[in-house]
């Protein structure tokens, strides 16, 4: 490493996110790994469902400095235009009556263009998350993503042009993935410079093409340890660039196999500290919410010591 202090960063703003799940809506194809309906356990929400969900969250959640409604789980900007606008109008109602501060959504990189970005910008959308998964051309093909890496670069550029914050969602450990694929994704962060990322270690969801390939013996899963180490590679690449990693792993549910530790984020961060120590890195700047990971790493490397720093 050729920099003096490795700085672990965390998201500085933690708004209350009110999720509205639109599982697989807008998706024009099925990626090899995806089954959003089983992951979320919900189907298409009506406008009444949206209103009920938002009001319910607002009624029992502790007030925070910021509150946002998020349309997750599908390809929001690929919805039929009138359906998308109906959801947007419902969200805008809550913004304009002062109940929430902004809207956000998730979508595919190939479903962002200047027209749609302008609609989002003019409708109080401040964050858009792109399901990138990988920046390796070969792996994108294996995942059946039907777009290339250049499309990701272009969509990020468009969103930034309109002043919309960008989050990127990556997958690690897909069965066809190689170490080189992860290195390509990690390196791409230097150009993409998202505002934050999420990392989802691979889980073989039921009724997905790749799960059937695993079951038939066509392809094998990587070991959990291999997947965790590749997750660490991407995690450290983000940390080096001071890009917050706001989540690691899918939410737990009855339809998501329990492959990884419940404290997955802490485990990955601890492995990151351990890797840095092994490589000879001697100074880390660790925010409060990484201290558990530091203590976990200290069990492996007892010589690690914590010192107070005014910048930490």
PLM-predicted stretches and their roles:
Residues 62-65:
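Glycine-rich phosphate/diphosphate-binding loops that line cofactor/substrate pockets in enzymes
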Residues 39-52, 58-60, 73-202, 206-226:
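Conserved non-cysteine loop/helix-boundary elements of the Radical SAM core domain that shape
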Residues 1-17, 209, 216-312:
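Auxiliary Fe-S-binding modules of radical SAM enzymes
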Residues 11-49:
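Canonical Radical SAM [4Fe-4S] cluster-binding loop centered on the CxxxCxxC motif
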Residues 22-24, 107, 286:
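Hydrophobic residues in beta-strands and at strand termini
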């Amino acid at each position: 490493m050729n920099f003096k202090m490795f700085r672990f960063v965390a998201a500085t703003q933690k708004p209350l996110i009110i999720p509205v799940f639109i599982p697989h809506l807008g998706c024009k194809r099925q990626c090899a790994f995806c089954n959003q309906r089983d992951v979320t356990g919900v189907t298409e929400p009506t406008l009444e469902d949206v209103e009920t969900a938002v009001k319910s969250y607002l009624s029992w959640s502790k007030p925070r400095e910021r509150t946002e409604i998020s349309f997750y789980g599908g390809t929001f900007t690929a919805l039929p235009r009138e359906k998308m606008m109906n959801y947007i109008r419902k969200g805008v109602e809550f913004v304009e009556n002062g109940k929430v501060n902004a809207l956000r959504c998730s979508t595919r990189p190939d479903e962002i263009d200047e027209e749609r970005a302008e609609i989002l910008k003019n409708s109080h959308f401040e964050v858009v998350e792109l399901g990138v998964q990988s920046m390796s051309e070969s792996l994108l093909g294996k995942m059946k993503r039907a777009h290339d890496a250049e499309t990701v670069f272009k969509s990020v550029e468009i969103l930034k042009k309109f002043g919309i914050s960008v989050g990127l969602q990556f997958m690690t450990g897909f069965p066809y993935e190689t170490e080189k694929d992860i290195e390509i994704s990690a390196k791409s962060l230097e150009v993409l410079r998202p505002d934050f990322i999420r990392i989802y270690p691979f889980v073989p969801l039921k009724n997905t093409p790749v799960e059937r390939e695993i079951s038939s013996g066509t392809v094998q899963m990587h070991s959990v340890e291999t997947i965790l180490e590749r997750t660490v590679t991407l995690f450290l690449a983000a940390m080096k660039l001071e890009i917050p990693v706001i989540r690691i792993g899918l939410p737990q549910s009855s339809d998501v196999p329990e492959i990884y530790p419940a404290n997955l984020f802490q485990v990955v961060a601890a492995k990151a500290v351990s890797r840095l120590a092994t490589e000879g890195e001697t100074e880390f700047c660790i925010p409060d919410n990484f201290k558990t990971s530091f203590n976990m790493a200290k069990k492996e490397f007892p010589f690690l010591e914590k010192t107070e720093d005014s910048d930490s």
